[in-house]
Amino acid sequence: MQGSVTEFLRPRLVGIETVSPRRAKVTLEPLERGFGHTLGNALRRILLSSMPGCAVTEVEIDGVLHEYSSKEGVQEDIIEILLNLKGLAVILEGKNEAVLTVTKSGEGPVTAADIQHDGDVTIANPDHVICTLTGEGSISMRIKVEMGRGYVPASARRDAEEEDRAIGRLLVDASFSPVVRIAYDVDSARVEQRTDLDKLVLDMETNGTLDPEEAIRRASTILAEQLDAFVELRDIKEVEQVEEKPLFDPILLRPVDDLELTVRSANCLKAEAIQYIGDLVQRAEVELLKTPNLGKKSLTEIKDVLASRGLSLGMRLENWPPESIVDND
């Protein structure tokens, strides 16, 4: 039975099948109908294009001036050697680039295991063949490895470095992603009576520098962080200029003379230092009757005048008197 139309099923990680040290299958279910392709395609694109990794970016080979040449005593031509170097799986720890060296002579293959490097560099595929020496052949090369993301063709860097690039520095197309292959499949899933749900199976292979499960976790984190901007999206409202409301009704700040009381009543209030209407309304009837020469007739007059202005005796005014009155006094 389907729940509320505003509620969506939350998938769970069903299992991780390790096919090999570099390949794994990750299964997620149940997903709402159509979400299998939505999430599968998004994760696939991120895994292929947005995962950081290391790649060979430059190579210098002794005796070689450009890539369209060959080297005596080496079976492969220079272009083939560069293609083989692109297959190196390197891990850099604590730095963004490193220069590796290879020096070897004598007949036989030159592999990644022959590379000399620092302790903060790891070669994940030491059996990878770089080239093959024949007879008395020898080779010496310097390999620059950098950290990056996505795919950066050599032509993009060649234009920027043309003036500074030394002769013999061979630029290499760099594919930084540690993910070699990623595919996904969407199967049917069932929860209770619902049979229209999706099951997402991600089949991924890396170059050995990153665990497949960790790659999925990183890709999911990247996707979630990018979507956060939409989750926090709010309508942009114009800031309204709110007029500051006065602390007291303006009538309370006016002098008692504005009440136009009789001379007798006005003089009695002045004798008691009641200067403002705000002072007057805080007085109680009993208190005013104690004022010399102010009788019940004057009290009735004061009450009637205040009532006509929506005021009365015995009111409580917090923070009275205001600073403006104190300053004027």
UniProtKB/Swiss-Prot annotation:
Enzyme Commission (EC) number: 2.7.7.6
InterPro entries: DNA-dir_RNA_pol_insert (IPR011262), DNA-dir_RNA_pol_RpoA/D/Rpb3 (IPR011263), DNA-dir_RpoA (IPR011773), RBP11-like (IPR036603), RNAP_asu_C (IPR011260), RNApol_insert_sf (IPR036643)
Pfam families linked to this entry: RNA_pol_A_bac (PF01000), RNA_pol_A_CTD (PF03118), RNA_pol_L (PF01193)
Molecular function via GO: DNA binding; DNA-directed RNA polymerase activity; protein dimerization activity
Alpha C-terminal domain (alpha-CTD): region residues: 248-329
Gene Ontology BP, a term: DNA-templated transcription
Catalysed transformations (reactions): RNA(n) + a ribonucleoside 5'-triphosphate = RNA(n+1) + diphosphate
Assigned GO CC terms: cytoplasm; DNA-directed RNA polymerase complex
Stated role: DNA-dependent RNA polymerase catalyzes the transcription of DNA into RNA using the four ribonucleoside triphosphates as substrates.
Family (UniProt): Belongs to the RNA polymerase alpha chain family.
Name of the molecule in the record: DNA-directed RNA polymerase subunit alpha
Source species of the chain: Colwellia psychrerythraea (strain 34H / ATCC BAA-681) (Vibrio psychroerythus)
Native organism taxonomy: Bacteria, Pseudomonadati, Pseudomonadota, Gammaproteobacteria, Alteromonadales
